[in-house]
C-alpha cells in the first residue's frame, strides 16, 4: 500500500482539471478547482466540492482554495441507480483482541488474546455507532484444519459478543483477521475455504445483523486466487442457508482503497444470488498507507486516496464500505479524516459507511485507540465521528 506513485501523480496534476466525481474545492484544498468538460464543480459542504455532471464549460482560472457554491446535481442514470442520500447505512468501529497473540496458537484467553468488552461497545452504541467489526483468528476457531470442528470455548466467547451487539440492534462484522493465510501459509484450497465459511455461517444463519467478512487484508497473493477465495466464501455462506446477511469481500494488497481501481478490478466479477456483496476497502493517511504513523501526508490526503475507489464502485454498479480508517490525533489528520468522511457522505449512492480502526480493551496508549473512555483516538475524534452516525 505504498503511496509514492499516488503522491507524485497528484503533485503533477495539481493545476490540471479534476476528473468526473473528483474533488474540486473545499477548505484547505490545494488541487484542481475546475472540472473536465461535461462536469461542473458543485459545493457539497465547507470541506468538499465535487465535479458532478453538468453543463458548465471548463475553466482554467480559479483560486486554489475557492469554494464553488453552485447547485448540486444528481448523478446520471447511466452510472448509478440512486442519488447520494448523504446518510450512511453503517458507521462504527473495529473491535480488536480475539486475533491478538499472532503465531501463538491456540493461546490463552486473557493472556495472549481477549474478546471485546461488551460494556464499552454499549457505550459506543449509545452514541449512535451501529456497526462493530470483531476480529478473530481462524486457527483458534478451527484449530486442526479449515474443515475441522470448532473450538467450543472460542466459539462461545465469540457468540456472546455477537449476541450482545446484535441484540442492541447494531450490526456485527465477523472478521477472520488472517490476511488470506492459515497457520502462516497462503490459503489455496478454495473448497476447504468454502467449507469453513459454510460451517461458520450455519452458526449465525438466523441472525440478519451478522455480516460475514471473507478475510482481512489479502496481500501478496495471486489475484485470481483472491477472486476465487472470495467467491468460495460467498458460495459457502449461501449454501449454509444464510441468505439475509451482507457479505463484505476484501481485495489483494491489503484491500487498499487508494490502489483498488488498478489492483482489484477483477473482483467486479464476484456474484451473489442474494445481491448483498459489499466491497470492503481500508485506507490510512500516513506516507505509505500502512497506518503505522501519527503523521498524515496532508489535510487533503483522505480524499485524494479514495476518489479512484469511488469512481470504480460507481462505474461497476457496486457498493463499498471503508472497513478500516484512522489518523493521528493532530489537526492535519483531523482535516484529512473530515475530508475523507465528507467525500464518502457525498457519495452514499456507492459508499455504505465506514469503521474506525480500532477499539478493544488491550490497546493501552495505542495512537488510534477508540476504546472508551480514554483511548487516544476516542478522546480526540469521538466528537467528530459521532456526527456521522446514522
Curated annotation (Swiss-Prot):
Record's catalysed reaction(s): Endohydrolysis of (1->4)-beta-D-glucosidic linkages in cellulose, lichenin and cereal beta-D-glucans
Record has Transmembrane helix as a keyword: no
Gene3D superfamilies: Glycosidases
Post-translational modification: N-glycosylated.
Top EC class, one word: hydrolase
One GO MF term: cellulase activity
SUPFAM superfamilies reported for this sequence: (Trans)glycosidases, Cellulose-binding domain
Main subcellular localisation: secreted
Enzyme Commission designation: 3.2.1.4
Glycosylation sites: 157, 261
Record key words, sorted: Glycoprotein, Glycosidase, Hydrolase, Secreted, Signal
Leader sequence residues: 1-16
GO biological process: glucan catabolic process
Record's keyword annotation contains Chaperone: no
Domain CBM1 span(s) in chain numbering: 17-52
One Pfam entry name: Cellulase
Subcellular location: Secreted
SMART domains found in the cross-reference section: fCBD
Record's GO cellular component terms: extracellular region
Sequence similarity: Belongs to the glycosyl hydrolase 5 (cellulase A) family.
Function: Endoglucanase that plays an important role in biomass degradation. Binds onto plant cell walls to participate in the hydrolysis of cellulose.
Note: The biological conversion of cellulose to glucose generally requires three types of hydrolytic enzymes: (1) Endoglucanases which cut internal beta-1,4-glucosidic bonds; (2) Exocellobiohydrolases that cut the disaccharide cellobiose from the non-reducing end of the cellulose polymer chain; (3) Beta-1,4-glucosidases which hydrolyze the cellobiose and other short cello-oligosaccharides to glucose.
Full protein name: Endoglucanase gh5-1
Phylogenetic classification of the source organism: Eukaryota, Fungi, Dikarya, Ascomycota, Pezizomycotina
Gene assigned in the entry: gh5-1
